[in-house]
C-alpha cells in the first residue's frame, strides 16, 4: 500500500516506473501519473513524472520547463490546492508540485510543508511567491522578479549581503503575508496601483502607516486581522529595477 511520509512516497518494493497513479490535473481533468524516477537531493525527494490524459496514448512531463531547467521534477506534498490558492487536506490525496512552481519553491526556500510546524509558513510563502495579495489565487508577479523573504522566527533570515544575484540596498519592503494573502503591503511587485488592489478585493484593506520595524512600513493593511498573524515578509526590487534574471534563495 502506498504511503506518504514527510514528502516521500513509500511502498513495499516500490520502484520508479512500476506504478501508475490515478489523479487530476490542475484543471480537474482526470489523468494517469507515472513515476519515472526518484532522487534524494537537499533533504527532499524529487520525482520525474509523466502524465497521460484520458483517451490519449501520449505520456508527457506536466511540469513546464524554463531556460534553466529543461526537465523539471516534482515534489510530493500532502494536501491539494484549489483555484484560489488555498490548501485543503483531502484524505488519501497529495499534490505533485513542479519544482518551478510556488509550492515546491517554498519548500526549497526552507518551509517544508510536511512539517506541521511549518504548514502555515509554507502556505504564506506560496501567497508571497505568487504575489497573491487578495488571497484569491490571482498572481501579481512575473518571471525573474528578484525577491528576498524572511520571517523573523529564525527559519529564513533576511539577506543583508551583497551578492552577484542580489543587492539589499536596491530592495525595498513589499508586503507581509499570512496563509490567506497579504497582511499588509507597501507597494505591488508589478507596480499595479494600490487603489486597483483595493478594488480587486473590496473591504479587505484600508490605508495604513503600520511600522513593522527595520524599515518595513505598510501603506495598506488588513481591516480585520485579529485572527491572523503575519508570518512572512518580503522585499523585492521595485519594477524599474528588475534587471537581473534571478531570484535570491
Which residues does each predicted region cover?
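Long, compositionally biased low-complexity segments
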Residues: 2-249
Amino acid at each position: 500500500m502506498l504511503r506518504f511520509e514527510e514528502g516521500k512516497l513509500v511502498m513495499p518494493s516500490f520502484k520508479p516506473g512500476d506504478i501508475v497513479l490515478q489523479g487530476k490535473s490542475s484543471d480537474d481533468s482526470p489523468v494517469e501519473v507515472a513515476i519515472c524516477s526518484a532522487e534524494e537531493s537537499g533533504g527532499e525527494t524529487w520525482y520525474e513524472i509523466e502524465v497521460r490524459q484520458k483517451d490519449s496514448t501520449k505520456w508527457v512531463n506536466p511540469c513546464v520547463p524554463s531556460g534553466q531547467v529543461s526537465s523539471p521534477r516534482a515534489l510530493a506534498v500532502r494536501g491539494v490546492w484549489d483555484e484560489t490558492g488555498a490548501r485543503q487536506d483531502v484524505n488519501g490525496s497529495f499534490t505533485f508540485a513542479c519544482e518551478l512552481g510556488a509550492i515546491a519553491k517554498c519548500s526549497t526556500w526552507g518551509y517544508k510543508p510536511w512539517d506541521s510546524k511549518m504548514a502555515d509558513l509554507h502556505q504564506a510563502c506560496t501567497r508571497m511567491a505568487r504575489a497573491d495579495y487578495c488571497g484569491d489565487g490571482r498572481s501579481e508577479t512575473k518571471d525573474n522578479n528578484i525577491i528576498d523573504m524572511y520571517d523573523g522566527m529564525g527559519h529564513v533570515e533576511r539577506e543583508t549581503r551583497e551578492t552577484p544575484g542580489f543587492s539589499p540596498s536596491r530592495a525595498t519592503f513589499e508586503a507581509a503575508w499570512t496563509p490567506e494573502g497579504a497582511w499588509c503591503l507597501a507597494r505591488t511587485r508589478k507596480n499595479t496601483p494600490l487603489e486597483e488592489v483595493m478594488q480587486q478585493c473590496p473591504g479587505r484593506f484600508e490605508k495604513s502607516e503600520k511600522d513593522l520595524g527595520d524599515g518595513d512600513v505598510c501603506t495598506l493593511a488588513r481591516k480585520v486581522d485579529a485572527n491572523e498573524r503575519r508570518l512572512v515578509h518580503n522585499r523585492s526590487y521595485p519594477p524599474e529595477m528588475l534587471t537581473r534574471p534571478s531570484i535570491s534563495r
